[in-house]
């Protein structure tokens, strides 16, 4: 087993539809018994969310185990603090097996928080949550403005879930001295970003991929989720592709609008992901059409 100071992990991050899964599978094929994959995806973490999340199929998942895919069901809610806790434990276990963790995905906030750390915030207060649920969203936002104006400025006045959580955190005094949870500072982190040189190249890839995500199978999947789980206020309601599917089922949009709205939302997601990448420090960026260069880079960096 490597000494702690020599431990290396890999980040492979990039916008949607850039072939990140194909890259790590190729690496696993070319360097057997070397890497273990940790998924960094806030939707693929959930069981039953398969079509709309672009989750690798069962055959791929059986052959190449992905940690943190199908990790919990929609009766539960995942967040960045749980991701950091789960991932740091996984990384230690992977090192114990003598392998290299490779974190791959497009949930940039998870990557960033793992690197930079977050405050060890208090858990939810059930009694307080029940009290707050009695208010409508406008009243809740007024409460937040009165109790913590600075926080209210950064939150959409219609985002009920975030408003409630902000009030909870403020009342639980998260601003007192708290430990910061993050990656071990002694780890060597090799960060690889995939980004298009031309936006049109990514839009083309999105257009090719989107019919496989936004189709009748997605509608059936969304209907199944609504029947199986209580998800009225679950974050999955806002996830790209699922949001549009739920809107279609509930009559908020029609069939002719559905596909175009998923396509637009996916492009907007990719735009936000690229914005993250452009401001990322210590990131080795590769064009989406230069996948072979990533392997050459890793061979050199890891001395494979």
Language-model features, listed with the residues they occupy:
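Phosphate/pyrophosphate-binding catalytic cores of soluble transferases and nucleic-acid-acting enzymes
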Residues: 1-304
């Amino acid at each position: 087993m490597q000494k702690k100071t020599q431990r290396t992990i890999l980040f492979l991050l990039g916008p949607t539809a850039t072939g990140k899964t194909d890259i790590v599978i190729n690496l696993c094929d070319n360097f057997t018994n070397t890497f273990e994959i940790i998924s960094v995806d806030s939707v693929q973490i959930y069981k039953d969310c398969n079509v709309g999340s672009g989750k690798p199929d069962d055959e791929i998942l059986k052959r190449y185990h992905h940690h943190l895919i199908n990790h919990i069901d929609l009766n539960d809610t995942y967040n960045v603090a749980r991701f950091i806790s789960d991932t740091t434990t996984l990384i230690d276990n992977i090192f114990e097996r003598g392998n290299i963790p490779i974190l791959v995905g497009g949930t940039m906030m998870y990557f960033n928080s793992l690197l930079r750390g977050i405050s060890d915030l208090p858990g939810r207060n059930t009694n307080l949550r029940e009290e707050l649920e009695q208010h409508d969203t406008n009243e809740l936002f007024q409460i937040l403005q009165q109790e913590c104006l600075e926080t209210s400025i950064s939150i959409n006045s219609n985002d009920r879930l975030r408003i409630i959580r902000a009030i909870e955190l403020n009342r639980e005094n998260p601003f007192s001295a708290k430990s910061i949870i993050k990656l071990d500072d002694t780890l060597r982190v090799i960060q690889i970003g995939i980004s298009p040189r031309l936006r049109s190249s990514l839009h083309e890839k999105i257009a090719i991929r989107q019919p496989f995500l936004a189709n009748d199978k997605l509608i059936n999947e969304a209907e199944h989720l609504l029947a199986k789980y209580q998800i009225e206020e679950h974050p999955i309601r806002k996830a790209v592709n699922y949001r549009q599917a739920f809107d279609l089922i509930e009559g908020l949009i029609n069939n002719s609008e559905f596909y175009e709205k998923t396509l637009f939302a996916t492009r907007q997601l990719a735009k936000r992901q690229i914005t993250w990448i452009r401001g990322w420090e210590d990131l080795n960026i590769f064009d989406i059409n230069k996948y072979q260069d990533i392997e050459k880079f890793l061979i050199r960096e890891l001395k494979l």
